[in-house]
Amino acid sequence: MADQQLPAEQVDGIRDSYAFDEPAIDLGVLDNGGEPVTDARIRIPLRMVARHGLIAGATGTGKTVTLQLLAESLSSAGVPVLAADIEGDLSGIALPGVPGDRLAARTAANGQAWEPRANPVEFFALGGRGSGIPLRATVSS
């Protein structure tokens, strides 16, 4: 199924569905049977981001990378982001990424310009444990 090509009219429909004339964050491009369609950008309008969303998948399917991309994109658009990062997976957005051959090949194939950059980050620590600005949380009924 992954290597089957979508008919041209479906590709056109997807391209048109994600073409917004308003501020949006760019998630990537359409993968049509293993081939990136660089002019079919997958985007979410900023006004839609305040709604509920779900990122689900098996281990290794890109959930954390998707969250990083969303947080970085929102931050770049001037939208403050609060992310509860229990595992510490998102803390890397505080530093510029390290370019590599695989990343360069992927972004070039997707028609994306990639530059390493750091994002503004403040770290908080629940209950004063760990590094970061201590926060206290009280749960009551």
Each language-model region and where it sits:
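Short, conserved active-site loop motifs that form the nucleotide-linked donor/cofactor pocket
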Residues: 121
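ATP-hydrolysis module of ASCE/P-loop NTPase motor domains
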Residues: 126-141
